[in-house]
Amino acid sequence: MFKPIRKTHPLISIANNALVDLPAPSNISAWWNFGSLLGLCLMLQILTGLFLAMHYAADIETAFNSVNHICRDVNNGWFLRICHANGASFFFACLFIHVGRGVYYESYLYHMTWNTGVIILFLTMATGFLGYVLPWGQMSFWGATVITNLLSAVPYLGMDLVQWIWGGFAVDNATLTRFFTFHFIFPFIILALMMIHLLFLHQTGSNNPLGLNSNVDKIPFHPYFIYKDIFGFIVFLWILVTFIWKFNYLLMDPENFIPANPLVTPVHIQPEWYFLFAYAILRSIPNKLGGVIALVLSIAILLILPFTHSSKFRGLQFYPLNQILFWNMVIVASLLTWIGARPVEDPYILTGQILTVLYFSYFIINPLLAKFWDKLLN
């Protein structure tokens, strides 16, 4: 019998098995749209970044002016720059929702998929930080100085590590050049990891809102979820483009429109909004090394979730007390984001410390509460 080329061609058949004939649970909701949205975001960032790199100069004398030149003189350069900057914000928003959905529906039980996902999250955060340095404004320079300086807290190797990253004794031309190099290459590494992430996901199949085995109720990915994803793309792009045209500089720091000056420190040094929760956790620990460990743990703690899982049912939809705890955690993360943008003074210091304790306590209380609920059901 004649088979279509998408099933017989050695290369096209791989894409076919991943996007067309893939068996998917029939009941996955809109929360499952964010995976494909992240793929769209990554493509958008790579494309806009590629065109920006054609006009950008990775030199401390010309970097700031080259960004200015892109926005003023290059055809639609302003659109590319703002699309890239706001695209990063939307990328992280989708990323946090995607991780949140994984925590809520306990998708972390697919160990390999979850672990690669956390590595992607780390790499994306590194890429975002490197990109923040490139315009070489005040916040770029001082943000790079403060964050890279944290590595000096590493025992014995600290200062050597910092100078190795800087390429000298201060943040200078060598630092900017290597930051641009890594900012350019990381998205392609993320793309490769994303394919591995999908490979592991397709080994097990997707989770679903009921947390049950859906092998008896699978439908082909195309046309059902292809159209669902396309609808998600349209809504996402509509919101992004509206944001670009109406609130283009809303998420950027005014300090970064001033050329970098090593002799003048900004009143309040802070990263982009999507790092503020981790930055607040870092600042809440009075000890430098302790702060760095807490900063890394704020993301790395996601890796322990598969090992602390104790519930009989899969997903928090069956655990009302855990749902309250989860949404409390979302509020805590939002408040940490707010605290990260506040100056280091009372009452913000104490508030940040309380919120940090609440943030980490979620990972301890959640499995205990699930166990308690299971006991009540017995």
UniProtKB/Swiss-Prot annotation:
Subcellular location: Mitochondrion inner membrane
Quaternary structure annotation from Swiss-Prot or TrEMBL: The main subunits of complex b-c1 are: cytochrome b, cytochrome c1 and the Rieske protein.
Needed co-factor(s): heme b
Record has Transmembrane as a keyword: yes
Record's cofactor remark: Binds 2 heme b groups non-covalently.
Record's bilayer topology term: Multi-pass membrane protein
Binding site for heme b b566: H98, H197
GO biological process: mitochondrial electron transport, ubiquinol to cytochrome c
GO molecular function: metal ion binding; ubiquinol-cytochrome-c reductase activity
Pfam families with a match to the protein in the record: Cytochrom_B_C, Cytochrome_B
Family stated for the protein in its record: Belongs to the cytochrome b family.
List of residues binding a ubiquinone: H202
Keywords, in A-Z order: Electron transport, Heme, Iron, Membrane, Metal-binding, Mitochondrion, Mitochondrion inner membrane, Respiratory chain, Transmembrane, Transmembrane helix, Transport, Ubiquinone
InterPro entries cross-referenced by the UniProt entry: Cyt_b/b6_C, Cyt_b/b6_C_sf, Cyt_b/b6_N, Cytb/b6-like_sf, Cytochrome_b, Cytochrome_b_C_euk/bac, Cytochrome_b_N_euk/bac, Di-haem_cyt_TM
Record-level GO cellular component terms: membrane; mitochondrial inner membrane; respiratory chain complex III
Protein name: Cytochrome b
Disulfides per UniProt: none
Domain of life: Eukaryota
Keyword Iron recorded: yes
Main location: mitochondrion
Additional facts recorded: Heme 1 (or BL or b562) is low-potential and absorbs at about 562 nm, and heme 2 (or BH or b566) is high-potential and absorbs at about 566 nm.
Encoding gene per record: mt:Cyt-b
Role, per record: Component of the ubiquinol-cytochrome c reductase complex (complex III or cytochrome b-c1 complex) that is part of the mitochondrial respiratory chain. The b-c1 complex mediates electron transfer from ubiquinol to cytochrome c. Contributes to the generation of a proton gradient across the mitochondrial membrane that is then used for ATP synthesis.
Transmembrane domains' residue ranges: 34-54, 78-99, 114-134, 179-199, 227-247, 289-309, 321-341, 348-368
Residues annotated for heme b b562 binding in this entry: H84, H183
